[in-house]
Amino acid sequence: MGKTLIVDDEEDMRLLLRVLINSEDRGLRVVGEATNGEEAIALRSDVTPDIVVLDYRMPGLSGLDTARSLLEDEPDLPIVLYSAFIDEAVSDEADRIGVRRCVNKGDVTGLVRALRELTAAS
């Protein structure tokens, strides 16, 4: 089962992601939502996600800082950085710390593909 944690400060984006992920027929299911990195870190142990969809720009901890913290506790946790602000430097840093995929927020098909691939691989 692809238990998914969504982390995004925009309520509309969390709703869109929830509908998209829960409508997938590949065993994906949203088990938690957080509005910032601090909430995600606190929530992770309660919902034990198989995969995390994480915004890059949020108040407080950035997506990369949040990913770094989550991966310190669980190095094999698949994280997808999903943002409108991904450039080569962000992508390189994400890769360096262990983020599995970086997907532009406009690329819904790419997000679904990444979630399917990462869920199948785990």
Annotate each PLM feature.
Residues 64-75:
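Short amphipathic alpha-helix used as the core "switch/output" element in two-component signaling
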